[in-house]
Amino acid sequence: MTDHKKLERVLKATANRRRFNILAHLKKEKELTVGEISEHINLSFKSTSRHLSLLFAADLVEKTQRSSEVFYRLGDNLHPTVLEILKHV
């Protein structure tokens, strides 16, 4: 994938206020379950899960399954643009 395509995908994923809030919470908390994230952003579990799927597809978050719960954290290789934006939250 070209750098321009990747940047476009990243910017589209972060352009949504709810997804941006998810990234901001993950920056502070390091790792959260879908349920914990949905409580933080006042959104249903299902909608939160959908937003997390989009962030995962854009390589902005990583997930780990432990027992019956999925834990999300910021990706290790975040795009420099996202890192710069997250410095200000």
Per-region residue spans from a language model:
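Conserved segment of winged-helix/HTH DNA-binding domains
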Residues: 2, 28, 69-89
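Short alpha-helical elements of helix-turn-helix
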Residues: 13-23, 80
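A short acidic, leucine-rich amphipathic alpha-helix
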Residues: 36-38
